[in-house]
Amino acid sequence: MEIGTSSTTNNIGVAPTIPQDIVNNNNHNNNSSNNSSNNNSISSSPTDSSQLMNGEQSTSPPSPPIEEVLEEEPRNLLISLLSELKIGVDLSRVPLPTFILEPRSLLEKFTDNMIHGEILCNLSKLESPMDRMHLITKWYLSAFHYRKKGLQKPYNPILGEIFRTRWEFKETNSNCIMVAEQISHHPPVSCIYLSNRKDGYTMTGTINPRSKFLGNSMAVIVDGSSTLTLLGLQEEYVITFPTAVARGIIFGTLLTEIVGNSTISCKQTNIKVEMDFKAKPMFGGEYNVVCGKIKKGNETTHTFNGKWDKKVEITLSSSSSSSKKKNGSTNDILWDCNDAVKTQMITRQISEQEEFESQRLWQKVSHAIIKKNQKDATFEKNKLEDEQRKRVKDRKENNIEWEPRLFKKVNDQWIYKYQNHTLYDQNEPKEIETDGIIHFEGTLIKKESKQNLVEKCGASENEIIV
């Protein structure tokens, strides 16, 4: 089961959140009238199906819904559940009702980072370290505007769950491949690896999300970080994340805000970005405001401010030693949502996916949620969780220690087992992905036997596809 490049590149747009066959089976219609005003103007180009490899699909995501107010019955159910919880309690072990779930796994949600991945195509060609940091900051901000309004939480991945996908970028005729795996369930830990060596970068991430109940809101705090590596320049950009806060879960309008601090830092260039995602004040103010500064050592060279779902402007600091710029305004556009082109995600069709791949694993839950059949959604979700508990019990009884399939721990850091940080050679074979392993087309890969996977994962043979 491979995901790789095709010989011709197509101009693709918009990463999906719900597989097209799930959408089609449920006649799920996402009208453009449901788009927010800023999303209406974001362009994407149609997918040329002739560029897809056998068994692949590329689909656009549903339009983000408008803000919502829960109906009386589900709200009463949520109030009943939350009334028994203490403020500050960790929600990772609390079975949340399915009507607040987004029909995709957290592993798939990580692909939001590449909705506008074409921004990075020429990153390694920029000569100025400051210009490179500006472009990385622009890309970072581009990931937030596509989000579910209201209360929409992705599925907690089960242990051993994987997600794999790719994107094709027309500008550089490059192929970007991503694999992700849930390497721990309690506490939840997700690992991701992304490779686009032709454009000169890879990215590794270890994410430890935790949720807290805060009364009329709940917060999803994202511990961990991602590291974007520029291969030819040997620069590493360490990225941290803000907090998502869902408000109005008991009374009021349901909405999600991005709040708190995040950073992008490069030790090799001594440049750091400090960002502050602002919560809307109780009276006045606006949603989705971000401000920040870019520092070279201890000197602030630039500041930026705006709305990450619309436009963010960057200004050369008056105190900066490089402010001998041209006379007049020093304001530039750092990020403009209206001018952004989305990039379409390509995955295997669900029928071609492995049993523990996110879209196939959760497909029955997703079907039910899309149809707003909470009874079936709850049944299917509980079934998956019961099966996971049984596997944990079986491993414990048989003294089997579970091992991640695609990632390994080295010096207290999780790294992708098959990472390749060598410089791209234009004469090298195409880089493709097979069963989670990124490799050159035409080269043999060592595949573990079904029995070894059964022993490691604690699953039945019928659940393993090799």
Swiss-Prot record:
Bias-annotated ranges (Polar residues): 1-12, 46-60
SUPFAM superfamilies: Oxysterol-binding protein-like
Low complexity bias locations: 24-45
Entry-linked PROSITE patterns: OSBP
Matching Pfam families: Oxysterol_BP
InterPro entries recorded: OSBP_sf, Oxysterol-bd, Oxysterol-bd_CS
Region (Disordered): 1-67
Gene Ontology CC entries for this record: cytosol; membrane
Family named by the database record: Belongs to the OSBP family.
Protein name: Oxysterol-binding protein 4
Species of provenance: Dictyostelium discoideum (Social amoeba)
